[in-house]
């Protein structure tokens, strides 16, 4: 009986073991590489017909594996492992001392990831296998596979596997992970790229310096713009020539004064071109030729006391300050003509001709034979003692020196040719006119009184002309002048006379005729001829009393333009006044203005008044002479 009972108990136990839950993991420890995929396998068996719930948990190491690899494990852990051979100090510890996380869980076909592993390539495949896409450094640890069934509670429902994540050692890191170079190593390719970028920036810097007006490293030819270098190539060649000691050969450069429509002249002074008063040490080349000979360039004298680079820097500084427009302005604006230089020292233009004659002009003939003059101007400031003597300067050297000196504008202009036979007003004639105008000799006969009376009458007539402009409005007078483009005539200025000349006494009664138009012969005034005929027809007393209508007045009646064309001063026919009045009038008279415009006026605009003059002559001959003033005559004063 007892034997039968024992057999049934053993059979029941065997049946329970076969029908219970069993979970197994084929690999207890697995090693995987970093950033590589891996699969942790898990198998289970159950007698339940309902779907099981699969869950994977992660438990970190109890101790860091890094200390074990470096030999830094504690002595206590080693002693415990020796006592219990089945106990592992890295895996066997309480869950409170390490990190525990749910990796993933599967129920049916639904997979749910834990909070820490969301977003990663992790899933449960097959029945209970855990698949990880890319391993990370924190994935090393202990993974547990847990199977849960609702109607099978007996058996072993979990098992664990150790995962160790390792990295590659002994290999260089990948410089270009997503780019593969097959023809060369990656480090060679990266080095070539960096070198090319550096050379590109160097080329851009050279082109920027050479092609733009900045401080640059000169004499480096830029390949992108070789013709636009900012460095002075000519100055560089001049510096090399200065060091070598021979003149540089510069071809293709035109002359500095070969400008069309501009009169040729000498070279401007050094002060006109540059502000610096000290010129560089230049010496003229050996060129012995006339004014038409071609001169060579200048060569820089070698000086042992000065460094050659100082000369180069000086020339570069002077070229930087050079202004061609300033040179042209100074060439025409700084020249002073001979006529304007007469009044350079004294601003009073109404000075007498004796003071102007007192200034002696230099004579060119005296300078030709003056050795001190040529030794001073051609020898420089060093003096005649150090320079060559005056006899060494021949005629060709003097002519070359004259052509090299700057000339005034009036010397460069062409001279005007006056017609032959026209009396020119020279300084001697002006001086004689000043003597006769201001200081007339007094004679006791009647002719002197008549002359004084005539001159007084002309002055009163000129005052009457000036009074005409004073009585009328200035706007009307200047309006008439502004509408006329012709220059002022002698009558407009208020004076009509000619320089007095010494003539015989028998020709004193004849009129003095002056033609102020170049190129025309002197012409007689027909009004004076008519007045002479009238005096012959009148009785003697009337002729002695004198006609109050003088030729000067008739010339004023003819118009200002006709009076200026036939400008003359006849002998006076009226005796009045005293010596005191004559002295006062002579002292009040001022010299007329003088200009070159009187001689340069052509007969073109004066010839247009000739028909008007002829018509006025006909009217004057038809009308009888009338008294135009109330001056008392000599006969009316006789009691």
Swiss-Prot record:
Residues 21-186 are lumenal. The modification Phosphoserine is found at residues 473, 579. Residues 21-162 form the Ig-like V-type domain. It is found in: Endoplasmic reticulum membrane; Cell junction, Tight junction; Nucleus. Residues 208-639 are cytoplasmic. The keyword Cell wall biogenesis/degradation does not apply. May be involved in ER stress pathways with effects on lipid homeostasis and insulin secretion. With ILDR1 and LSR, involved in the maintain of the epithelial barrier function through the recruitment of MARVELD2/tricellulin to tricellular tight junctions. Also functions as a B7-like protein family member expressed on immune cells and inflamed tissue and with T-cell inhibitory activity. In the inner ear, may regulate alternative pre-mRNA splicing via binding to TRA2A, TRA2B and SRSF1. This is Immunoglobulin-like domain-containing receptor 2. The lineage of its organism: Eukaryota, Metazoa, Chordata, Craniata, Vertebrata. The gene is ILDR2.
